[in-house]
Curated annotation (Swiss-Prot):
Pfam families per record: DUF3258
Protein name per the record: Uncharacterized protein ORF157
Gene3D superfamilies xref list: 2.60.40.2930
Listed InterPro entries: DUF3258 (IPR021672)
Signal peptide: none
């Protein structure tokens, strides 16, 4: 029986004067955001140790001075040999002032609101909240509900 390998994976997490990059991993198995094992404030990175499995990477990239925001969802697969495959499945661009208000919208999917809420503070990295519960919907339903919500939200504004 082969031993499962743990893989190190890093994402960007920084909030500077004019731009912000915010990425977090979501565990498909545990149905909640993965807690990073290390925060690197100097480089603006979060470091994860991942077991083989499937993850969803949420990404938010902002140019504050230009009122621009891009949100992405990517599937991340770690195989038993430690090889990582990543594929972007959704991307949308909008105004930053619209996106920042989403976390206060009662119609916003819970996971999206939590992702926005956990964005990094000024000159810090994001802090992932631990949770004693997981979301009820499966990964595909969750991604589809986020996509539908954002398409409606951005079309209406």
């Amino acid at each position: 029986m082969s031993e499962m390998s743990v893989v190190e994976y890093e994402v960007v997490s920084k909030n500077l004067t004019s731009k912000m990059s915010h990425e977090l991993l979501f565990s498909v198995k545990k149905r909640w955001f993965v807690k990073p094992f290390r925060h690197d404030r100097q480089l603006g990175k979060l470091h994860y140790k991942l077991l083989p499995g499937n993850y969803i990477k949420f990404g938010l990239y902002v140019l504050k001075n230009q009122d621009y925001a891009r949100f992405e969802i990517a599937w991340v697969h770690v195989d038993k040999d430690g090889k990582i495959e990543e594929r972007t499945v959704y991307s949308i661009e909008t105004y930053w002032h619209i996106f920042i208000d989403i976390e206060n919208d009662l119609n916003c999917p819970y996971v999206l609101a939590k992702f926005i809420e956990m964005r990094p503070e000024f000159h810090k990295t994001a802090w992932v909240e631990e949770s004693n519960y997981s979301i009820a919907e499966d990964d595909i339903q969750m991604v589809e509900s986020i996509k539908r919500y954002l398409e409606r939200k951005i079309a209406s504004d």
